[in-house]
Amino acid sequence: LYFVIGVFIAICGGLGNGIITANLPQIQGEYALTPSQVAWIPAVYVMANVSANLLLFKARQQFGLRWFSEISLLMFMLVMFIHIFVQNYPMALLVRAMGGFVAAPLSSLGLYYVMQAFSSQYRLQGLYIGFGVSALAIPLAWIMSPYLVNVNDWTRLYTFEFGLALCCFAMVVAVKLPRSLRIEVYEKKDILTFLLLAPGFGLLCGVLVQGSILWWENSPLLAYMLIGALALLMSGFFFEHYRKNPLIMTRWLGSFALWRFVVGAFLLRLIMSEQSYAVVNFLKSQGLTSDQFVGFYTVIFFGMLAGLIVSALTFSRDHLIPPMVVATLLVAIASVYDANMLTSEVRPQNFYLSQFAVAFAGSLFMGPLVLMGFGLTLRQSVNHVITFIILFGATQNFGGLVGSAFYSTLQQQRTQYHKQSILQQMQSTDATVTQRLQQYQAGFKPVITDNNLSQQQAQQSLNQIVTREAQIKAYGDIITVNSYIATFLFAWGMINIARKKYIENRQKAAIKQT
């Protein structure tokens, strides 16, 4: 029972946002939003989620995780209930922000319920599964989306999300976790830390989301947001550095071992953008809509599930790096395969094998990564756990945002480059180009009698094909870049394994000599 409740709660934490993300184009049309405006809807979810992680650990210590989750769920249900009747853009932003805030305690609560279902002997396998099941919400959302969303009436979706929150609340109240020791840990200074860091992280999220839309060099707003983010974050860390009982252990942030872990965790999350950004947006650029992704995300769902099961079954405290190395190798191979396959004829079915491998890799590395981070943290003290939770959450949230922002920027630049390159190769006097234009013009003549207009339409059709081919080449470029990063991580992992083996052999040799 604990296992079923834990899985349900963990998946529900991200399911609603996943469905909204899958249907952003429809929501944009529903509320008549610009691309910049609609991008704020998933952005505020991440902002609130990062902010909630600042409060979560101490809230669990002082009030209990169940109490914190119940209050968060009640607030979310209230806002969701209002949203059923008041469907507008500001309310959509408020609901997504509340959803992001609630998702943080729900994912932790789901983890604890799953772990409670395992005996102490297999508790760490429960940790692997508890962390992994929350990721299943994204593919599940895309699979369910066509059956829940009606562009003429969004009430069904909002009612469904309200029902999920209600079910989670009922489960938490009916089946309680064992009581944990509660201690007074909050200080008044924690409020100032939160007021500095939460908006700082929020502004940074906003910059990453809006950068490739408003364009980095063209919008003064992005500059002001970035300056504000840096000022708030630096002030927050400076304030924490000189506190007697800091929320964040700033001195630990300077250690080499921690930064090696942070960079590795960040890059592991970034290379998963090959799936979440590159392949999905390539297929969208070919005209596919959300209902045509059901089979694609079904494959991803089972890939994640398979990776989760294999990760739990092959668990070993002494061998945490090998699963991550295997994961990077799978992503590198899948990226090379995808980059060399892109054409205008490609459909989701062509990506099933590679994306199953990427999804498998994503679940395979998560458990060992978390366990490695906790081991690094507990070597310091329990007081360092909050710092780890914030850092790990930041690597995963910002890794995804940076991946999307970086690849989106690169895709736009490479599209323009390839478009200019194709146009330079196409001379207007070229017989092939002339013949193609004549074919297009002949196709328009039955509906357009004016010769000049039919010529313009023919030229426009040719330009659309040029743009499409340039986009295909650009997506191939960003997937190739992703393969380079994955290959670097694979090499880094192999070096670490070899180094560890070398040190162990030297220690064994020294013991034999003595």
Which residue ranges define each predicted feature?
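Central cavity-lining transmembrane alpha-helices of secondary-active solute carriers
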Residues: 42-58, 104-111, 298-311
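Interfacial helix-cap and linker-helix signal at transmembrane-aqueous boundaries
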Residues: 27-29, 59-60, 92, 114, ...
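12-transmembrane solute porter fold
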Residues: 2-16, 21-22, 35, 245-415
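MFS transmembrane alpha-helix packing/gate-lining sites
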Residues: 16, 45-52, 102, 133-138, ...
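Hydrophobic transmembrane architecture of multi-pass small-molecule transporters
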Residues: 391-499, 504-514
